[in-house]
C-alpha cells in the first residue's frame, strides 16, 4: 500500500471509531482532534509521516478502547443531542 492510502485508511478508521462514543462531548472532541491532527500534518515529509503513522495506529487502538469503555458506562443523552 502506498503511504497516501495508508494515511487515508487511518483517517477513516479514526473517524469511524470516534463516532462510536456514546457521549456527545467525547465524540465531538475526538472527531475534532482527528481532523485537526491530520490537517496539521498533511505537508510533512516521508520520514516524519512514517513516525506519525505509528503514532496514529497507537491512537486508533486507544480510541477503540475508550469508545468501548464509554459505551459500557453510558449516561442519559444531553439536550444538544
Swiss-Prot record:
Subcellular location: Mitochondrion; Nucleus
Pathway assigned in UniProt: Cofactor biosynthesis; iron-sulfur cluster biosynthesis
Keyword Mitochondrion: yes
Keywords: Mitochondrion, Nucleus
Gene Ontology BP terms: iron-sulfur cluster assembly
Superkingdom in the source lineage: Eukaryota
This protein's GO CC annotations: L-cysteine desulfurase complex; mitochondrion; nucleus
InterPro entries membership: Complex1_LYR_dom, Complex1_LYR_LYRM4, ISC_assembly_LYR
Biological function: Required for nuclear and mitochondrial iron-sulfur protein biosynthesis.
UniProt family annotation: Belongs to the complex I LYR family.
Name this protein carries in UniProt: LYR motif-containing protein 4
Native source organism of the sequence: Dictyostelium discoideum (Social amoeba)
Gene name tied to this protein: lyrm4
Amino acid at each position: 500500500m502506498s503511504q497516501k492510502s495508508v494515511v487515508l485508511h487511518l483517517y477513516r478508521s479514526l473517524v469511524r471509531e470516534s463516532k462510536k462514543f456514546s457521549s456527545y462531548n467525547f465524540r465531538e472532541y475526538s472527531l475534532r482532534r482527528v481532523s485537526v491532527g491530520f490537517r496539521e500534518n498533511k505537508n510533512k515529509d516521508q520520514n516524519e509521516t512514517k513516525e506519525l503513522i505509528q503514532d496514529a495506529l497507537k491512537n486508533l487502538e486507544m480510541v477503540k478502547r475508550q469508545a468501548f469503555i464509554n459505551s459500557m458506562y453510558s449516561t442519559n443523552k444531553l439536550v444538544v443531542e
